[in-house]
Every structure is written in structure tokens, then in C-alpha cells.
Regions:
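Alpha-helical transmembrane segments and their immediate juxtamembrane cytosolic regions
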Residues: 3, 7-476
Length: 476
């Protein structure tokens, strides 16, 4: 063996070591910093099990937590910028599993928040990542996936066929929505079943209860009154856990017009029209269909997320190329830091979900509530909330790109299958909400027991997806 041949493996190792060790050392340093700082901040903390209890951190303890979060974020950013390719997402992959994982995370948030029992999971799902909920992510990502799929599809088919496919899917979802609304109502008629969790909605701000199935008892009359059939067909009644489905059906119905605009390269016109409709509803609330979903998800407002997601999916390749440039990387770093800042803002929310919850008190309660009402309300999609959604999606996508292999091993096995069947999960979770509400002990205030209940629902849902239970009936 020649000297040069013998030196090659050594040279490879010498070149390889700094590329691999730097991010590892940064990660270990960040983890140690975060653990130490959080321990210092939470020293002497024990969970409060009183109703509405929890822990609020003031002064130094609160800033220590912020410092730990900042250190961890900066370490992840630096590691992502200087790390090797061995753990990054393989750009040659045909299907973008990063989107599947994020969609899986979003639908898990939706499931846990709709099955509203106080558990440890809620410490992560109730705006812990910023003033964002799973619903916004669900709508935006649905648009992104549709944009990606139909840009490819239109390379091998015409607009007429694409329109037919979109309307066929909208029709299938509409029929599914009708069946779920009726099936839930019939299930509540079974002896011993308490259906209030799906037939009423309690406004937590004032304690007022609203009926979600007005006049539905007349459905059993003969003949059935016309106004009852009208309300059912227009999706003016049904479980609140399911009402966003009506929004999605309407968005799919108008999607051919949106796709046609993108195909003609009228993206700027499309976005301007979308913002104009958003502005109209911000100035004066307009209910076009008087459907149930238009109260929590006003159509003219929430279309903005779907349209921008659609455009991002359509121009995905161009956006990714831009993100790889120096300016693009700088923009991603700013997005990550901005998302962290909004998460810290959200941690100042004075409302505690259960006795294990921890909040910061860096902002006076009145100041936080004023800012939240002005910029971050969910139904009206305040400008701050829209910014938070955009920054969080960019940040999570960048994180998954830089650390794909370890995150895929840790979370992907569970979240990716759910993300590939989000509509299926969304349908079945409504029935799980009814079941959980009728299990003795759940929802009674025992956080650990409720955590087990949430875990059981997630596990059963995952198994149903893996076993493809009723996949031929329920859309995915």
C-alpha cells in the first residue's frame, strides 16, 4: 500500500471531524445551558393542583427561561447553518415529508384542543409556540399541498380535468360533513350518552352556552320541516369540533379559479384580491353563507391563509431556491428569531390551562390582553397572528430541513402517517370527543388521568391510520 493510499482514510477523517462535531458540541452546549437555566428559573417550583392553578414566573426567573430558550434557538440556528449534510433533508425525495410531519403536528394540536380535558399535552398545544393554533396551520398547509399537487398535475392534464377533480373532492368532503353531522346527532340519542360536548359550545370568556343543533329535534318529525333540511344542507349546525370542514369545502369549490390565476402567472393579482377581501371583513364583518363555520372562521378572512398557502405550494421550488441564497438564509434566521419573540410574548398569557402550567409575567396582564385583542385574535386573524403563522411555518420547515434525520426518527414515525391522513384524523376525532366525554373520570380535573386519556386517543387514531380502518369510506 502506498503512502498516499494509506493517508486517504486519515485525510477523510480529518476533514470529516469538524463538520460533524461542531453542531454536536453546539447542541450539547445548548442543551446543558437550557437545562441549567430552566432549573435555576424553576427552582423550588412545584405544580399547583388547585382549580385554575399553575405557576407564574416573575423577574429573574422569567428572564432565565427566556435566556435558555434564546440560547437553544441560537445553537440550533448555528448548527443548521454550519452542519453537514448527513442529517439534512434529502432534497431528491419526491414527496415532501416535512410538510407531512408539520401537518401531523397541526392535526395533533387540533385533536388535543378539541378533546378539551386538562392534560399535560395542553402545555404544548395551547399557543406554547406562539399565538398560533392548529387550525391556522391546517388551513395554510392544506393550501400549500393543493398548490404543489396541482402544479404537477397540470403538467399532464388540462384545467377542465383538474377542475373536475377538485370539485369531486369538494363533493366528497361535503357528503362526509353531512354524514358526520347526522351521525353525531343520532349518537347523542343513544341511551346513557351525554352529548353536550358535541351539541353545545360554552364561551369560556363569559360562560354562555350556545346550542349547536337548533331545531334538530324536528328532524324526527314527519314531514321534516324545510328549514331543518335547509340548515343541515347549508352546514348551519353540527359539532363545533368539526365546523372548519365547511370552510374547507367552500375553499375547494373556488380553488379552480385560484389555480387558474396561478397558472396564468397572476399571483400578485390573486394575493392582492385576497388581501382586499381580508380588509373588507376586517372593516365590516360579512357572512356570505350564514353557515356555522363563519362565526369562528369567517370565510373572507380565513381564505387569506389558504390562498397564501396555495401560492407558496405552487412556487415551492422557487421559494426553496431563494432560501438557499445568502439573503434567503438571513431571512430564515430572522424568521426564527421573530418566531421565538412571539413565542415569548405568548408565554405571558395570564390564563393557565391547569395546575402544571407555567407562564411568564414579563408583561402586565392588562398590556398583554390589549395587545392580544388588537393583533392576535384567532377568528379575525389579527395581523400579529398572521405574522406568527408565517414565521412559525418558516421556522419549523427550516428546522426540519436542517435536522431531518434525527427528528424523523424521533417524531416522524408517529406524525408523518397522521399528516398524510389529516382529514381522516379530523373526522374520527369528533367521535373520540364524544366517547371521551362519556368515560367516567376523564375531564374531572385529574391532569395525569386526562393525559392518559389523550394519549389513548392519539394511539388509537395512529393505529387506525396504520391499519387503514375505513379508508375506503372516510376521505384522507
Amino acid at each position: 500500500m502506498s503512502a498516499s493510499t494509506a493517508a486517504r482514510p486519515l485525510a477523510r477523517r480529518e476533514l470529516h471531524v469538524p463538520r460533524r462535531r461542531t453542531p454536536v458540541l453546539l447542541g450539547l452546549l445548548a442543551l446543558a445551558t437550557a437545562v441549567a437555566a430552566t432549573a435555576a428559573g424553576l427552582a423550588g417550583w412545584t405544580p399547583s393542583f388547585a382549580a385554575g392553578g399553575g405557576t407564574v414566573l416573575h423577574g429573574r426567573s422569567a428572564w432565565v427561561v427566556v435566556g435558555a430558550a434564546t440560547a437553544l434557538t441560537l445553537a440550533l440556528v448555528v448548527g443548521g447553518l454550519v452542519g453537514g449534510t448527513d442529517r439534512r433533508y434529502p432534497e431528491s425525495a419526491e414527496r415532501d415529508e416535512r410538510l407531512d410531519l408539520v401537518r401531523g403536528l397541526a392535526i395533533v394540536f387540533v385533536v388535543l384542543n378539541h378533546i378539551n380535558i386538562p392534560s399535560l399535552f395542553q402545555l404544548l398545544t395551547q399557543e406554547a409556540w406562539g399565538p398560533v393554533s392548529g387550525a391556522e396551520l391546517f388551513v395554510a398547509l392544506s393550501g400549500a399541498v393543493l398548490g404543489m399537487v396541482y402544479r404537477r398535475r397540470l403538467q399532464s392534464t388540462d384545467m377542465v380535468a383538474a377542475t373536475g377533480a377538485l370539485w369531486q373532492r369538494a363533493g366528497k368532503l361535503y357528503r362526509t360533513a353531512l354524514l358526520v353531522v347526522l351521525a353525531i346527532f343520532l349518537a347523542t340519542l343513544l341511551p346513557g350518552v351525554d352529548g353536550r360536548v358535541v351539541t353545545t359550545f360554552v364561551d369560556q370568556s363569559n360562560g354562555q352556552t350556545y346550542g349547536l343543533y337548533p331545531n334538530v329535534g324536528h328532524l324526527l318529525d314527519y314531514p321534516v320541516p324545510g328549514y331543518v333540511l335547509r340548515d343541515i344542507l347549508l352546514l348551519r349546525l353540527g359539532p363545533y369540533q368539526f365546523n372548519i370542514m365547511g370552510l374547507y369545502v367552500v375553499l375547494l369549490l373556488v380553488s379552480p379559479l385560484l389555480v387558474a390565476a396561478l397558472r396564468r402567472r397572476l399571483v400578485l393579482v390573486l394575493l392582492l384580491v385576497s388581501w382586499a377581501l381580508y380588509g373588507v371583513n376586517a372593516l365590516r364583518e360579512v357572512s356570505l353563507l350564514h353557515a356555522q363555520f363563519e362565526t369562528p372562521f369567517p370565510l373572507l378572512t380565513w381564505q387569506l391563509l389558504f390562498v397564501h398557502g396555495l401560492a407558496a405550494g405552487w412556487y415551492r421550488e422557487a421559494l426553496l431556491r431563494g432560501a438557499r441564497t445568502a439573503w434567503g438564509r438571513a431571512g430564515v434566521v430572522l424568521a426564527v428569531l421573530g418566531s421565538l419573540a412571539l413565542a415569548v410574548f405568548s408565554w405571558n398569557n395570564p390564563f393557565l390551562s391547569n395546575g402544571w402550567d407555567v407562564r411568564l409575567a414579563l408583561l402586565p396582564e392588562s398590556r398583554f390582553l390589549d395587545l392580544y385583542r388588537q393583533y392576535f385574535l384567532r377568528p379575525t386573524l389579527g395581523l400579529g397572528r398572521l405574522l406568527a403563522v408565517a414565521l412559525l411555518l418558516v421556522s419549523v420547515y427550516a428546522l426540519l430541513t436542517a435536522y431531518w434525520r434525527p427528528l424523523r426518527r424521533a417524531l416522524g414515525w408517529f406524525l408523518v402517517p397522521l399528516g398524510q391522513a389529516t382529514l381522516y384524523v379530523f373526522v374520527v376525532h369528533v367521535f373520540f370527543a364524544l366517547v371521551v366525554a362519556n368515560v367516567p373520570g376523564l375531564g374531572s380535573g385529574n391532569v395525569l388521568l386526562d393525559t392518559v386519556g389523550h394519549a389513548a386517543v392519539l394511539a388509537l387514531t395512529w393505529l387506525m391510520v396504520r391499519r387503514r380502518v375505513l379508508f375506503s369510506v372516510i376521505p384522507r
